Amino acid sequence: MTKYVFVTGGVVSSLGKGIAAASLAAILESRGLKVTLLKLDPYINVDPGTMSPFQHGEVFVTEDGAETDLDLGHYERFISTKMRKANNFTTGQIYESVIRKERRGDYLGKTVQVIPHITNEIQAFIERGAASATCGEPDVAIVEVGGTVGDIESLPFLEAARQMSLRMGRNSACFVHLTLVPWVATAGELKTKPTQHSVQKLREIGISPHVLLCRADRRIPDDERAKISMFSNVPEDAVISVWDADSIYKIPQMLHDQGLDAIICEELKLEPKAADLSMWSDLVEKLEHPRHEVTIGMVGKYVDLTESYKSLIEALRHASMHTSTKVNIEYIDSEEIETHGVESLKHLDAVLVPGGFGRRGTEGKIAAIRYAREAKVPYLGICLGMQLAVIEFARDVVGLKDANSTEFDQETPNRVVALITEWYDREGRVEKRTEESDLGGTMRLGSQRCPIKPGTMAEEIYGKDVNERHRHRYEVNNRFVPQLEAGGLIISARTPSEDLPEMMELPRSMHPWFVGVQFHPEFTSTPRDGHPLFKSFVEAALAHQQSRTAAEVGEKA
């Protein structure tokens, strides 16, 4: 039978519940347990797919095409279990399901209320999510409850967790509460009162936490931990200090050293083998002792909010570990390039244009792509980054000066990138796609396997085929592919059924490393294995740096 660990948060948001939950999962997995994670989001949106990256951060896409919270990305990076749609649900989904049942008459005319109908539905979603785990029936399901204790939106989820714990009985569920212990500079001390009040608020709901994870900018002294223990009624050894670390991959060892996994296993009456965190120690060692260093420019419009590119940043970090190369990411606002030109790119070892949407800043990105192509700087374009690379090539190499995407210019006669529903086939016929089409409307989501063209750089990187996740509405238009190929561009991968371009590259005779991908490879990168595309990209950046350095030395000589 699956046992549950509920992770809640108090005092303030953004303390790192997702990292804490994922780290605990990693430790338990290292002890031989099958583990899955779920994220409960209190907002009323059905999913984060249409939410602004400025408010919500990155939208993480699962293998089965669900648009989910970025914490699911942390889950997949920390454990081997893959996440699915059932691993993340929102208040919006819960109410939608309950209202649908009410309309069908499932409640037999009863008054539908938060208790028991909403809370029962939440429990059903939790159990369904745990049962759908890709690892088989999990020994432990860790459930992260979004929001902060005291928020009105979180109350039904906390009540459902309380009811579920009561229903399942002793040693079947436990609660871990993450709080803030702030350092007050004027007083010169850590303050435990916010944590005391947060636990008090949780106990008012009927939940007594078994473990407290106390976040601070420094290690919490034993006397302060004893004070928190006394006022919160949590054993002192279960008051765990979680201080700021320069890498999230140090957190599993930090929690294990303080006995978190032992406390959880004791509470749930689990007797797994001893933990083996050597993999995490090795990864941290690689991260902290690189042999090389490169600077990669990420050109985008969300550069002030790195949460928007969380998986991408982590994928580059994974490549850093596996190539012994420190990767410095320089965030460059594409609108600044439109105003001031490409001077800010000239010291870079590689250029990356990530996914995005909307017209703002696109001409700056295209200017950056042109610079990378002409200066022979390694370039990686992801999703929109590939589409803009095709547009730049069509304009500046093929000669279609007004080439564009219909996302930015509905009137352009040369629609080299177009919405799926207004897509052209190779004969120039418009292919209409609707909600009933195989692609499911105007968004392509989830994993898709595609064969790779032999003899290409893509084949060197991936092998015979590629299986990556998608999240986009626009596609490279097949009508223009013959002209692009005549100019030298290579379509190195296509979808097997719809014949849609998946990867593009330039031959080495034109450029040493220039690759665009329609999918999002960052979603499948893990610290355990890295990712072949990002490893190749970092290696190309290092090779470019070394060749440039050699040329500069030659000039001085």
Swiss-Prot record:
KW Isomerase (keyword) present: no
Sequence positions that bind CTP: 13, 151-153, 191-196, 227
Active-site feature positions: 383, 520, 522
Source organism, top-level taxon: Bacteria
A GO CC annotation given for this chain: cytosol
InterPro entries: Class_I_gatase-like, CTP_synthase, CTP_synthase_N, GATASE, GATase1_CTP_Synthase, P-loop_NTPase
Gene Ontology biological process: 'de novo' CTP biosynthetic process; pyrimidine nucleobase biosynthetic process
Pfam families hit by this protein: CTP_synth_N (PF06418), GATase (PF00117)
Annotated EC: 6.3.4.2
Record keyword GTP-binding present: no
Binding site for Mg(2+): 71, 144
Residues noted as binding L-glutamine in the record, renumbered to the chain: 356, 384-387, 407, 473
Domain Glutamine amidotransferase type-1: 295-547
Binding-site list for UTP: 13, 191-196, 227
Transmembrane segments: none
Gene Ontology terms for molecular function: ATP binding; CTP synthase activity; glutaminase activity; identical protein binding; metal ion binding
Activity regulation summary: Allosterically activated by GTP, when glutamine is the substrate; GTP has no effect on the reaction when ammonia is the substrate. The allosteric effector GTP functions by stabilizing the protein conformation that binds the tetrahedral intermediate(s) formed during glutamine hydrolysis. Inhibited by the product CTP, via allosteric rather than competitive inhibition.
Keyword terms of this UniProt record: ATP-binding, Glutamine amidotransferase, Ligase, Magnesium, Metal-binding, Nucleotide-binding, Pyrimidine biosynthesis
Location of region: Amidoligase domain: 1-270
Catalytic activity: UTP + L-glutamine + ATP + H2O = CTP + L-glutamate + ADP + phosphate + 2 H(+); L-glutamine + H2O = L-glutamate + NH4(+); UTP + NH4(+) + ATP = CTP + ADP + phosphate + 2 H(+)
Residue sites binding ATP per the record: 14-19, 71
Function field: Catalyzes the ATP-dependent amination of UTP to CTP with either L-glutamine or ammonia as the source of nitrogen. Regulates intracellular CTP levels through interactions with the four ribonucleotide triphosphates.
Quaternary structure note: Homotetramer.
Family, per entry: Belongs to the CTP synthase family.
Other known facts: CTPSs have evolved a hybrid strategy for distinguishing between UTP and CTP. The overlapping regions of the product feedback inhibitory and substrate sites recognize a common feature in both compounds, the triphosphate moiety. To differentiate isosteric substrate and product pyrimidine rings, an additional pocket far from the expected kinase/ligase catalytic site, specifically recognizes the cytosine and ribose portions of the product inhibitor.
Designated name of the protein: CTP synthase
Species, as recorded: Paraburkholderia xenovorans (strain LB400)
Gene name in the database record: pyrG
